[in-house]
Amino acid sequence: MDIPHEAEAGAWGILPGFGRHHHPSSDATLFSSSLPVFPRGKLQLSDNRDGFSLIDDTAVSRTNKFNESADDFESHSIGNLLPDEEDLLTGMMDDLDLGELPDADDYDLFGSGGGMELDADFRDNLSMSGPPRLSLSSLGGNAIPQFNIPNGAGTVAGEHPYGEHPSRTLFVRNINSNVEDSELTALFEQYGDIRTLYTTCKHRGFVMISYYDIRSARMAMRSLQNKPLRRRKLDIHFSIPKDNPSEKDMNQGTLVVFNLDPSISNDDLHGIFGAHGEIKEIRETPHKRHHKFVEFYDVRGAEAALKALNRCEIAGKRIKVEPSRPGGARRSLMLQLNQDLENDDLHYLPMIGSPMANSPPMQGNWPLNSPVEGSPLQSVLSRSPVFGLSPTRNGHLSGLASALNSQGPSSKLAPIGRGQIGSNGFQQSSHLFQEPKMDNKYTGNLSPSGPLISNGGGIETLSGSEFLWGSPNARSEPSSSSVWSTSSTGNPLFSTRVDRSVPFPHQHQNQSRSHHHFHVGSAPSGVPLEKHFGFVPESSKDALFMNTVGLQGMSGMGLNGGSFSSKMANNGIINSGSMAENGFSSYRMMSSPRFSPMFLSSGLNPGRFASGFDSLYENGRPRRVENNSNQVESRKQFQLDLEKILNGEDSRTTLMIKNIPNKYTSKMLLAAIDEKNQGTYNFLYLPIDFKNKCNVGYAFINMLNPELIIPFYEAFNGKKWEKFNSEKVASLAYARIQGKSALIAHFQNSSLMNEDMRCRPIIFDTPNNPESVEQVVDEESKNMDLLDSQLSDDDGRERS
C-alpha cells in the first residue's frame, strides 16, 4: 500500500525503504553530514579515505510515494529500536580524541628535516583508533624508532632506505624556541664532542646535532629521550640524509679498502687501521677477499686513516682506501652489476623498513643464471668430477658476486672457488665461463658421456678475488673473458704430464707470491699465471703437447680423435701453441661476445694485439691468430721481468701502457704519470682514434733508463684509473719498437705528423741526463718536438 513519506519518517529523518542501503540525512538531524544508522552491535567505520562512510546528501522529496515491502517494514521497525543519537555519539567522539592529534606541520617538518619517510599521506590515512604512537622500545644497537599509526593506516619509519643506522646526527624535536644555543650545546656536549649544531629552524621546533663519535649519539639519545627542556619533552631521532651523501661526506665513518692481499686477516687490518682510531667493525664482502669495509666509531679516525693509508703498500700490494658511499645504491643495480662486479657505490641495498645488521652488505641468495644452461656443454659439465662440483648450493650464490643476471647475454660470470676434490690435491673449479654459441662446424659432435679426467694433481684455480684483481685485463671490459681453469677440455682426457707444482693452494700461493713482482704478463694478464694455475711446463714443447692432448676427445672420438682440434685450427680459431697462457699449460677457453665460436686463448702474436683478448676482434671482425709453435717464446719477450731489470739483464726502456680509458687525453695521462714519475721519461705517445675523437686504449712511453721502469710499474701496473669512474686496470708490457731514436724514426715519416699537434708524439728534452738526449737532424722530426700548448701551462718541464 502507499504510505506517505512524511508520516513514516523515523526519528532521524531516515526514510523507510533505504534501511539496507544509503540513508540520506534530513535537515532535521543534529549532524547534516551525518553518520548512518546501524544496529548497535554492528557499528563500525569503513576503510574509506577519511575513515568514515560517505553519505549521499541528495535531497529526497517528501512528496514521493512508493510501495513498501514486508522487509522494508521490518527494517523500519528495527530502526525504531536504536538508541537516541546522544547515546550513540558519546563513545564515538571519545575515541576520536581530536584534541591530541599532532599538528600536520610537525609531520611535514619531521619528514623533511630528518630523512623520515611517510608511507602514504599521513592526514589521509589516520584511523579512528587514536593518534600515532612512537615506539622506542629498543633503541640500543641498530633499533630504529618507528611511528605506528593504528590499524595500519601508515607508518613513519626512522630508517632511511639507503643509509646505515643509527647515525651520528640526531634530529631533536619539540624544542622550545627560547632555548639558547649555548644551553643546547652544554646539554648535548656532555655525551661527546659535537661536530655541528644546526639551530636555524629552532623557531619551528627542531634542531639537528651531529657528533663525531656514533657512540656519543647513541648515548645522548638514550639519556635525553623524553627529558624536559624548558617544560617541553625532547623527542629525539636518528637522522640520515634523504639525498645521496657526497663523495666527501665522512659522516658514515666507514672506509672501503681495495686490492688487499688475501693473506691479510681482519686482525692485521685492525692493527693497521686501529692506530688511527677505535674500530667498530671490519666487514668482508662475500667472494671478494681483496675488498673490505673498516668502520670507525669516530669519523676523525676514519679521516686520519684515509689520509695516512691510501695508496700505501700492505703485503706487497698497494691498497686503495675510499670513504664508503651508501647513497650509490640508488643507481641502476643490475645494469651496473652487468657492467662490472666491483662498483664501489654498491655497498648497501636495504629495503625500506628492514633492519640493517652488521653483516656484510647484500647478503642473501641470488638466483644464478648458469652460463652453460642450454648449451651443448651442459650435460658434459654436469657429469664432470671437476665441473660437476660447484661452490654454490642449489644454484645460488650469496652476496654481491652472484648478482649478475641475464641482461648482458655475454657477461654471465660466477666466481671460481677453491676446495679440494677428494684427497688428491685437486682444486675445486666452478663453471666460470660464458655461454658459448657453438656451431657444429667448429665443435664437431659433443658426447655427453664420460668424465673429464686428469691425473696431474695440484690444479689451482682462480679465486674470485684473483680473477677480479689478480688478472687485471680480464676486467678491462666486463664481457671480455670467461675461464675454464682446468687442465682438460676433452672427454675423456688423460694427461700423463708429471705435476711440477705444490699441490696445496696456500703453499703454492706463498711460492708464487714472490713472482708477482718479477714476472708480469704482457697481455692479456698483468699478473703471472703461475699464481693462478698449478703447473708450469719447462718448455713450449711441453705446453704444446699438453694443449694438443687437451683438445682431443671433444668430438666424442676419445683420446685419439682430434677432430675438434683440427677443425678449430682449419678455421683459424685456435693457435696450436696458444693454450698455455704465458707459456703455462693451464688452459683458458674464451667465449667472445662479438664472435660466436669458442677459441682457446693465450700465446697471442704480440705484434697483433692492442689490449687483451678483445683485440682479437676489432669492430666485430675476427683477427686470425697465426698458427705458430714459436708464439709462446715470442710472447715471453714482451713480458716485464723485474728481476732481470734489477740484475741489469734487460736494458729495454720503451713500454706499452694498456687499458687506458678512452676518454683520457695526453694531458690527463701526463698528469697521472707525473704524480710519481715526473722527469723519468723522454717520450710519450697516446694514439688517437680520429673518427671517434678518443684514444685507442694504449700508449707508449720511453723511460730514461731501465731502472726507472720498476717505480713506474709499481705506480701503474694493476691499478685502476682515477678519472671517469673507469673500471679499467692498467697493465704494462714492453713495446716492439725500443728506444727514443727508433721511435722518432718510426713516426717522423708518418702521416701522423700532418695531424693536430695534440695527436702527435711528445718528446722531452732532459738536459740533466745527457745520455738520454738524442739530437734529431731530420727536418720532419722537428714537428714532433712541438708540444700541446695546453700542456705547457701545466707542466714545469722544458720540452723542445
Swiss-Prot record:
The modification Phosphoserine is found at S384, S390, S789, S792. Keywords: Meiosis, Phosphoprotein, Repeat, RNA-binding. The keyword Phosphoprotein applies. Pfam families: RRM_1 (PF00076), RRM_2 (PF04059). Gene3D superfamilies: 3.30.70.330. It comes from Arabidopsis thaliana. GO terms for molecular function: mRNA binding. This is Protein MEI2-like 5. Transmembrane segments: none annotated. Residues 470-489, 776-800 are annotated as: Disordered. Residues 168-241, 253-326 form the RRM domain.
